[in-house]
């Protein structure tokens, strides 16, 4: 499974492939904890975050702390 995360100031839009599942979480402490727990349980092959002027840094740190495979990419 692969995970793509669209990062914005207040929220993270999360998309799982190939299942097509999508959900959103707040970009705050409780939201990041819930996201890390949910993704850890799913054991993705890779989580890809959009680089968005620094908003992605706390997200990347939380997911890395959960030992999730992670890539931060520039938006197209």
Can you say where each PLM-predicted feature lies in the sequence?
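Phosphate- and other anionic-substrate recognition elements at nucleic-acid/protein interfaces
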Residues: 1-76
